[in-house]
Amino acid sequence: MHWGTLCGFLWLWPYLFYVQAVPIQKVQDDTKTLIKTIVTRINDISHTQSVSSKQKVTGLDFIPGLHPILTLSKMDQTLAVYQQILTSMPSRNVIQISNDLENLRDLLHVLAFSKSCHLPWASGLETLDSLGGVLEASGYSTEVVALSRLQGSLQDMLWQLDLSPGC
């Protein structure tokens, strides 16, 4: 028997009962703040201002557009696709944004859990075989369109979070 481990566990036992859960409003506020931070990061990349998020670009149909009604599940799926696209890009401009999307997805999962929703981890697109060719042929355009559409999607998510979206 490992007495040291047992004593250590028994010593920590009272503290485990005093741990308080983070209020869900705090999680929702953190989610909104992170969305605003990501939008600011996108705005700081100067060339993203040149394309409308609603504009159709041939060959870039796999980049999600705007969705009028977003559930937590749809938000997570959309962010998973954007994260997959951004991590495939050679540009260093998008590394922090991709990391922020991962954190945002984690916060969405906490919000879903608080609503007793089972939110499976979305994996993004089934296949991005065409992405490699698109990035080689027009990496700059892909980055501009992806960031512009991501910005629009994030602004929609921010609005939807105020309406307390469903699962």
UniProtKB/Swiss-Prot annotation:
GO terms for biological process: activation of protein kinase C activity; adipose tissue development; adult feeding behavior; angiogenesis; aorta development; bile acid metabolic process; bone growth; bone mineralization involved in bone maturation. Keywords: Diabetes mellitus, Disease variant, Disulfide bond, Obesity, Secreted, Signal. Its main location: secreted. GO terms for cellular component: cytosol; extracellular region; extracellular space. Residues 1-21 form the signal peptide. Pfam families: Leptin. GO terms for molecular function: DNA binding; hormone activity; leptin receptor binding; peptide hormone receptor binding. InterPro entries: 4_helix_cytokine-like_core, Leptin. Induction: Induced by secretin. The keyword Disulfide bond applies. It is found in: Secreted. SUPFAM superfamilies: 4-helical cytokines. The keyword Signal applies. Disulfide bonds join 117-167. Adipose tissue is the main source of leptin. It is also produced by other peripheral tissues such as the skeletal muscle. Expressed by intercalated and striated tracts of submandibular and parotid salivary gland intralobular ducts. Detected by fundic epithelium of the gastric mucosa. Secreted into blood and gastric juice. Interacts with SIGLEC6. Key player in the regulation of energy balance and body weight control. Once released into the circulation, has central and peripheral effects by binding LEPR, found in many tissues, which results in the activation of several major signaling pathways. In the hypothalamus, acts as an appetite-regulating factor that induces a decrease in food intake and an increase in energy consumption by inducing anorexinogenic factors and suppressing orexigenic neuropeptides, also regulates bone mass and secretion of hypothalamo-pituitary-adrenal hormones. It is linked to Leptin deficiency: A rare disease characterized by low levels of serum leptin, severe hyperphagia and intractable obesity from an early age. Belongs to the leptin family. This is Leptin. The gene is LEP.
